[in-house]
Amino acid sequence: MTSASDHVLQTEGLTKDFRGFVAVKAVNLRVRRHSIHALIGPNGAGKTTCFNLLTKFLKPSAGQILYKGKDITAMAPADVARLGLVRSFQISAVFPHLTALENVRVALQRQHGASFDFWRSKTVLDRFNGRARELLNDVGLSEFADTPAVEMAYGRKRALEIATTLALDPEMMLLDEPMAGMGHEDIDKVAALIKRISAKYTILMVEHNLNVVANLSDTITVLTRGQVLAEGNYADLSKDERVKEAYLGAGHG
């Protein structure tokens, strides 16, 4: 039986009302430590709004968010990130004309509060080289350390984004559609990477690719019309008539 201490992220009655339109309604979420938890649902189900609430880019209309037992409902996004709850992929996290190594160094610089004065900070940034190379190795990009991001294949850019997110020293990562826009080969590589890093980090992801969800996720929460419709593993949910009906004729790609 899972105890409360096993849950790194919890919500109680999480609700967001946009002037009468309820985008998220009374969502109770439990994300277990060191698990991969997927949030899925048809278009307009409330997945992105839920992510924005969890990372504090939106203020809840009602409900509570607990991270590692701490109430973060009223906290600012930057403060939540400093606690180790970090979101990736909602915007590109890389600078296209910097190399992979330079991108990770800048992320490390941000995390450690070093100066962003690029024309004077080379000595400061050089201090982070060792850790940056470790992170590139973790995501399988060691041989691309000196390659500008703009020259990297799409899947490798995603891996670099994960490396820059890891540089922020998260305990839990929220991945917003990590497979968006990828071909099959890149999807396989990034899925393998996410599986590998889940040994050290808790992952909550929104993902439309149900094959990826089936292969990666320990737990899946299905949202529809802003509410939790069902929760469980893929094998059980794929047999749930309510889940089938929610997706029947509804776009989820």
How would you name each of these model-derived features?
Residues 2-253:
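Glycine-rich phosphate-binding loops of nucleotide-dependent enzymes
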